[in-house]
Every structure is written in C-alpha cells, then in structure tokens.
C-alpha cells in the first residue's frame, strides 16, 4: 500500500508498505490482525518475509492441534519460539479478535479497556526544511491532534525543535530519535531541555538499557523507551534501573495483547505512564491499537491517527477518523469493530497461503 506521503526517520524512509495480514478461523469465526514487521530489518530484526516463514513453519504448528479455552493462552503456546514477537503478535491478536466476536463484545472491552474514546497524537517524519515541518505541524493541529511528535537525527534536532517552540509555544511536543544518538551526545540532548518537551523517545541504542540509565540521570526531561522494550522482563528492568520514566507499548513489538497488558499492568503498578505507538499500520492493525489504547494506564495520547493521514484508501470500513477534539471513538461492534474490505484486500494481495 502506497503512503499518502513518504515517512522519514533517522533509520530509513518509507514510501510503500508491504503488509502481512493474518486471519484466524476459530470454530468458524474469523479474526483479523496485521503483522507490523517492515520490509527491511532497520527498526526490528524481523521483516515481513521472516514473519511469513515463522508463521508458516514454526508458530502455526505450535497451536494448530492444541486445545485452548481462551485467547490469553495463545502466547504461552508460542513462547517456545524465541523472539519473533511481531509474527507471534499477529497470530495472537487475530485469535483475540475472533474470540471477542464469538462472545459478541468489542475487543476493547474484551481485553479490559475502560475508555469510550482515546486521545490522539501524531508522528511527523523528518522534513527537508523547517518551513515544511512547521506547515506539517500546523496542518495536524488544525485537524485536532492533541500532541505532536517529530522525528529527529543528528543535524536535524535542535533547530527543528527551536522553530516549533517559536511558532507553537504551547503545544504538547515530543521528539523521537529511533536510537540515532550515543551517550556521548548527552550535552546536545541536554540542550533540548530548554524547549519543554514531554519526552525524548528512544534516544540511544535499541538494545542499550545501561546507557539510557546514565542518560536519564543527566536529564530532567523524561526518556521514553520504545525499541528497548520487547518483553515484560525488559520493561521491569528498565523501570527498576531507572532507564526511563515513560514506556511506549507497541502491540507487535511486544508480541500481542497478552504481553502488552502485562507490561501495561507492570507500568501502572510503578507509576509509569504508557502510550500506544504506531508502525504505519493499515486499518486492521490500527483497530487493534485503538482497542489497546483503552486500557486505563494509557494516559498519554498515542500515535493512533486517522486512516487518511497514511492512506488514500484504507482496507477497512468505516475508515478510522479523528474528531475535531483530537479523539477517536472506540467502536462498539464485536471484535475489532471495523469490517475488512475483502474486495480491496483481494485487489492488493500479491501472495497468500492457507494453513490448515
């Protein structure tokens, strides 16, 4: 699926998304989910191709002949495979959707959600010029989004933030480095504190908790961890070591709803706020993010935005929309609450496989 506009981070630039969709037939009820792995292993070691192989050859065989009484047992069946959370999460989430449909309840309620609407922020990629960035921010504020996140990298950090604080002094603003810096860059990151940021997301290495501990001691601005957190155990270590003050929970990165809820609960017990990050999902993945964001400790606006921000035409009906107040109404229909557009999915599909 071609994006409405290219999206650039410190790691790469995305113009087109190759999306892996997963259907789970649970006693005749179809659940849908999306594997968020990208085409290249820049954000995560996983790719769409590795996820396909893992689902077909390793993960599906682990559950195909197993009896389980609830969706929250699927994760434990898949845990024998190390890593590959995005592949695991897509299979597990599809089962959650099917189970919610079987019970006739919205997925949000089924996983323990408490909100009827969620607050929305927006993530803006690296732009060629400061004027282009400021115009993009103005457009998103006019659309109602409650929080602005911009991607940064060395050479495109202080000046973009300075410009936005000059033009928009009162907005909720944060930055995301996607591991673009090292601990030796801490004096530069310290300079960002003068711009009253909500947080600095994943400034250092994607697997480096130790350096984040040292950096957080030098900063008053909260560090938010993203790529460092793949498991409940890593989240616990980050919290107890003091590596961060906020955690971004991405459904695919942690392996699905079961682990996402465990991390959510852990953070809540320790007073660590969380929010839901995005991975340029289609509407199917976005629907799961909406449900996840209804849990009580998702107190910060996440990267769950309207379909039209990313796609000329989404693959669900209705498309995800954001209110003028910057919120998304949580659907009340059973399961994810949106209908996959089978005609459009068939038109876009280049490969499929049925596992029985």
Can you annotate each of these PLM segments?
Residues 309, 315-356:
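C-terminal extensions of enzymes
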Residues 1-43, 311-313:
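Structured beta-strand/loop patches that form or line metal/cofactor-binding pockets in enzymes
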Residues 33, 120-124, 146-150, 173-177, ...:
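Hydrophobic faces of well-ordered beta-strands that scaffold small-molecule active sites
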């Amino acid at each position: 699926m071609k994006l409405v506009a290219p999206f650039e981070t410190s790691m790469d630039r995305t113009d087109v998304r190759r999306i892996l969709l997963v259907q789970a037939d649970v006693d005749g009820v179809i659940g849908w989910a999306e594997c968020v792995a990208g085409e290249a292993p820049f954000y995560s070691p996983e790719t769409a191709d590795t996820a396909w192989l893992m689902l077909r050859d390793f993960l599906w065989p682990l559950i195909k002949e197993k009896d389980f009484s609830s969706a929250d047992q699927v994760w434990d069946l898949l845990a024998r495979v190390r890593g590959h959370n995005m592949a695991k999460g897509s299979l597990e989430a599809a089962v959650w959707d099917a189970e919610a449909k079987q019970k006739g309840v919205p997925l949000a309620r089924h996983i323990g959600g408490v909100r009827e609407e969620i607050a929305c922020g927006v993530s803006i990629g690296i732009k060629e010029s400061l004027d282009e960035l400021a115009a993009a921010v103005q457009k998103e504020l006019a659309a109602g989004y409650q929080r602005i996140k911009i991607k940064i990298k060395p050479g495109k950090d202080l000046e973009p933030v300075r410009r936005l604080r000059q033009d928009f002094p009162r907005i909720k603003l944060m930055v995301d480095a996607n591991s673009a810096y090292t601990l030796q860059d801490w004096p530069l990151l310290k300079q960002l504190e003068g711009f009253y940021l909500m947080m600095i997301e994943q400034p250092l290495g994607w697997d480096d908790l130790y350096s984040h501990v040292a950096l957080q001691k030098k900063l008053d601005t909260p560090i938010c961890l993203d790529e460092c957190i793949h498991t409940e155990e890593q989240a616990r270590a980050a919290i107890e070591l003091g590596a961060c003050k906020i955690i971004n929970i991405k459904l695919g990165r942690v392996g699905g709803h079961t682990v996402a809820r465990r991390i959510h609960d852990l953070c809540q017990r320790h007073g660590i706020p969380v929010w839901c990050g995005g991975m340029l999902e289609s509407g199917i993945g976005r629907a799961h993010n909406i449900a996840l964001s209804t849990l009580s400790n998702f107190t910060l606006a996440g990267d769950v935005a309207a379909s039209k921000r990313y796609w000329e035409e989404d693959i669900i009906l209705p498309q995800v929309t954001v209110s003028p107040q910057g919120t998304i109404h949580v659907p009340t229909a059973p399961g994810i609450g949106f209908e996959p557009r089978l005609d459009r999915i068939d038109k876009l599909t280049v490969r499929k496989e049925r596992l029985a």
